[in-house]
Amino acid sequence: MQKANIDGKVWRFGKDIDTDLIIAARYLSTSVPEELAKHVMEDADPQFVKKMSSGDIIVAGENFGCGSSREHAPIALKAAGVAAVIAPTFARIFYRNAFNMGLPIFELQESAEIAEGDEISVDMNNGTITNKTSSKVYKFIPIPQFMQELIDAGGLMNFAQNEIKGK
């Protein structure tokens, strides 16, 4: 495991953020991550890409990533510089796609307690999220080591290529 902590500013979104809100279908004529990144979350917050900085963290309500099974959604988030997504629950297919693309996501039932603009730190190894703004510490079930290895490698394809190369 390489990167144990993720530190960033929080951007809040509500529940049931579907993949079309993450990256609208009108932009799916490309699969170039940098192009997708320009439009991430555009229909939920048209100014999101302009406001956020690389390394920031999305904290959302339940059922994040519902809707279609498009892999473009986690690709766009990651390419835009979103360091992680925290929500009480994730749509099943988005959950798997996020790890396959190397985007860390964490299930936290108390995510509603974290406000937009808060500075937080996610300790992936110990399963804690520390809200540096409010000094509250939250526990989550750490992701399995294999899933952390996918994140460390930058996604499933990179992980597989590294395995083939013997790294």
From Swiss-Prot:
It is an enzyme of class 4 (lyase). One of its GO terms (molecular function) is 3-isopropylmalate dehydratase activity. CDD domains: IPMI_Swivel. Pathway: Amino-acid biosynthesis; L-leucine biosynthesis; L-leucine from 3-methyl-2-oxobutanoate: step 2/4. It holds the Pfam family Aconitase_C. InterPro entries: Aconitase/3IPM_dehydase_swvl, AconitaseA/IPMdHydase_ssu_swvl, IPMI_Swivel, LeuD, LeuD_type2/HacB/DmdB. Belongs to the LeuD family. LeuD type 2 subfamily. This is 3-isopropylmalate dehydratase small subunit. It comes from Sulfurimonas denitrificans (strain ATCC 33889 / DSM 1251) (Thiomicrospira denitrificans (strain ATCC 33889 / DSM 1251)).
